Amino acid sequence: MHKVIVFIFLTLYSLKSYGNDVIDKPHVLVSIAPYKFLVEQIAEETCFVYAIVTNHYDPHTYELPPQQIKELRQGDLWFRIGEAFEKTCERNLTCQQVDLSQNVSLIQGKPCCNQHTTNYDTHTWLSPKNLKVQVETIVTTLSKKYPQHATLYQSNGEKLLLALDQLNEEILTITSKAKQRHILVSHGAFGYFCRDYNFSQHTIEKSSHVEPSPKDVARVFRDIEQYKISSVILLEYSGRRSSAMLADRFHMHTVNLDPYAENVLVNLKTIATTFSSL
């Protein structure tokens, strides 16, 4: 009995300590999980990093519940990327906001989804080149906000930049072996990756997040025939059902990818390997 009481006491104490530790740290908000990974690589334990949308939801259609808005008000700093749900955050948050699309070479024009209030492709993290710019923005912002940790941030930022350079070289090697340069995807998430590594992206789902129309189906069929595409990439949480049905209709192989996976460095290599094996 004594051992049980001691165990319960130690468990409660550790939970209390963890809670106080989180409360004592500055809260840094990021819009999606890949940036949680990046900020944590740079800031280590100096900040508590909170992803507004986890990779269990589609950020394009996400709606913040009232309880989450209350939690977000603890934020001391917010790195945003241009998603539609950020408008709700903007109206309810007073913390410093930093747009990570700044200084990035953006793909302009009609966005991938009509939920967006931007006129550019917001999937900027799916490119090592873009990530290098964003890492520099994160390091500069954190160093100014929390100057007592600036040396740590700058050191970790340099390591991350080197890792991104190495990743870019690895992806170039992997993708150089690709035989198919035309990629069919359920949702247009890979514009920056395709631009950087010489692929062409063809999408099933257009900007409306609704079932493909007969016109869309005809367009997809033309792309399949013209470019001899034999596989379709299905994305987690976006357009899976309708795209899977089309893949079955056209007797195509399906591959699953998650553009919002938290470890973006590993994910980019996974994307490269997947594209090159189609």
Curated annotation (Swiss-Prot):
<dbReference type="GO" id="GO:0030001">
    <property type="term" value="P:metal ion transport"/>
</dbReference>
<keyword id="KW-0813">Transport</keyword>
<keyword id="KW-0732">Signal</keyword>
<dbReference type="InterPro" id="IPR006127">
    <property type="entry name" value="ZnuA-like"/>
</dbReference>
<dbReference type="Pfam" id="PF01297">
    <property type="entry name" value="ZnuA"/>
</dbReference>
<feature type="binding site">
    <location>
        <position position="187"/>
    </location>
    <ligand>
        <name>a divalent metal cation</name>
    </ligand>
</feature>
<protein>
    <recommendedName>
        <fullName>Putative metal-binding protein CP_0211</fullName>
    </recommendedName>
</protein>
<feature type="binding site">
    <location>
        <position position="123"/>
    </location>
    <ligand>
        <name>a divalent metal cation</name>
    </ligand>
</feature>
<comment type="similarity">
    <text>Belongs to the bacterial solute-binding protein 9 family.</text>
</comment>
<comment type="function">
    <text>Part of an ATP-binding cassette (ABC) transport system involved in metal import. Binds a metal with high affinity and specificity and delivers it to the membrane permease for translocation into the cytoplasm.</text>
</comment>
<keyword id="KW-0479">Metal-binding</keyword>
<feature type="binding site">
    <location>
        <position position="258"/>
    </location>
    <ligand>
        <name>a divalent metal cation</name>
    </ligand>
</feature>
<dbReference type="InterPro" id="IPR050492">
    <property type="entry name" value="Bact_metal-bind_prot9"/>
</dbReference>
<keyword id="KW-0574">Periplasm</keyword>
<dbReference type="InterPro" id="IPR006128">
    <property type="entry name" value="Lipoprotein_PsaA-like"/>
</dbReference>
<dbReference type="GO" id="GO:0046872">
    <property type="term" value="F:metal ion binding"/>
</dbReference>
<feature type="signal peptide">
    <location>
        <begin position="1"/>
        <end position="19"/>
    </location>
</feature>
<dbReference type="GO" id="GO:0007155">
    <property type="term" value="P:cell adhesion"/>
</dbReference>
<dbReference type="GO" id="GO:0042597">
    <property type="term" value="C:periplasmic space"/>
</dbReference>
<feature type="binding site">
    <location>
        <position position="60"/>
    </location>
    <ligand>
        <name>a divalent metal cation</name>
    </ligand>
</feature>
